[in-house]
């Protein structure tokens, strides 16, 4: 029994502490929720909501964005002036200094309010309401915090070459070049090769044959004679194809 009584008491104390902290927070304006309509109460199951403390109904709206995005709209909103006027009149009741941005290809409309409180009121009242036979949905637009109007430079990652930069960063160290891999055995074997000689790479075994490299001989005089003979040879003449005889139809 003691545990059953202590639980609600601790919960009420925690809620009261949170409410006091919210009231003491500087620069924060608190507004209560709009009362639920009869249809909404029926959807929620009905009942008396008087047991809810008014402090629990207060919500911090200071950090909410001042724009909403309307989705699932009828295509007539983007082409028909009368339908567009009806659509805008729904939101002008919450804010007179309101602007609209229509995105026909995305079938969405961005509604810009003068303050976040009007945007929150419109979202609470018009979200999932029927307009022109379709259920309209409202979402808060994402806010962008731009510190500077200039494009920020890219991060200097992986921009340092092996040579030291003009102003090395803290902790930069010179990278040593790797030692090239040289096969001295192969160079020694190639140096011992001569024209007309052969070199045995692998000796034969009982199960494998030997691998022998034969160096091709090069006769410089013979190559020069072949080149001179190729130059003396007459170039073949390309004979063009003869055009077929043409007889006009009116003369045939």
UniProtKB/Swiss-Prot annotation:
Coiled coil: none annotated. One of its GO terms (molecular function) is calcium-dependent protein serine/threonine phosphatase regulator activity. GO terms for biological process: calcineurin-NFAT signaling cascade; calcium-mediated signaling; locomotion involved in locomotory behavior; negative regulation of calcineurin-NFAT signaling cascade; negative regulation of smooth muscle cell differentiation; response to estrogen; response to ischemia; response to mechanical stimulus. Residues 219-228 have a biased composition (Acidic residues). Belongs to the RCAN family. Inhibits calcineurin-dependent transcriptional responses by binding to the catalytic domain of calcineurin A. Could play a role during central nervous system development. This is Calcipressin-1. It comes from Homo sapiens. The lineage of its organism: Eukaryota, Metazoa, Chordata, Craniata, Vertebrata. The gene is RCAN1.
């Amino acid at each position: 029994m003691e545990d059953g009584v202590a639980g609600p008491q601790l919960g009420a104390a925690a809620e009261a502490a949170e409410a006091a902290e919210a009231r003491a927070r500087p620069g924060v304006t608190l507004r209560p929720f709009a009362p639920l309509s009869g249809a909404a109460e029926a959807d929620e199951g009905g009942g008396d909501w008087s047991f809810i403390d008014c402090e629990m109904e207060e919500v911090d709206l200071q950090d909410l964005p001042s724009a909403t995005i309307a989705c699932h709209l009828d295509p007539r909103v983007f082409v028909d002036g009368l339908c567009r006027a009806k659509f805008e009149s729904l939101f002008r009741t919450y804010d007179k200094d309101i602007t609209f941005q229509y995105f026909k290809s995305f079938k969405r409309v961005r509604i810009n309010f003068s303050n976040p409180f009007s945007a929150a009121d419109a979202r609470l009242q018009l979200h999932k309401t029927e307009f022109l036979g379709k259920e309209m949905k409202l979402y808060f637009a994402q806010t962008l915090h731009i510190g500077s109007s200039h494009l920020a430079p890219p991060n200097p990652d992986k921009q340092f070459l092996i040579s030291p930069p003009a102003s090395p960063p803290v902790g930069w160290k010179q990278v040593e070049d790797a030692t090239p891999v040289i096969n001295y055995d192969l160079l020694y074997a190639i140096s011992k090769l001569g024209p007309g000689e052969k070199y045995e790479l692998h000796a034969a075994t009982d199960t494998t044959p030997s691998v022998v490299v034969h160096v091709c001989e090069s006769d410089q005089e013979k190559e020069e004679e072949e080149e001179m003979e190729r130059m003396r040879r007459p170039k073949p003449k390309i004979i063009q194809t003869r055009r077929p005889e043409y007889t006009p139809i009116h003369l045939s």
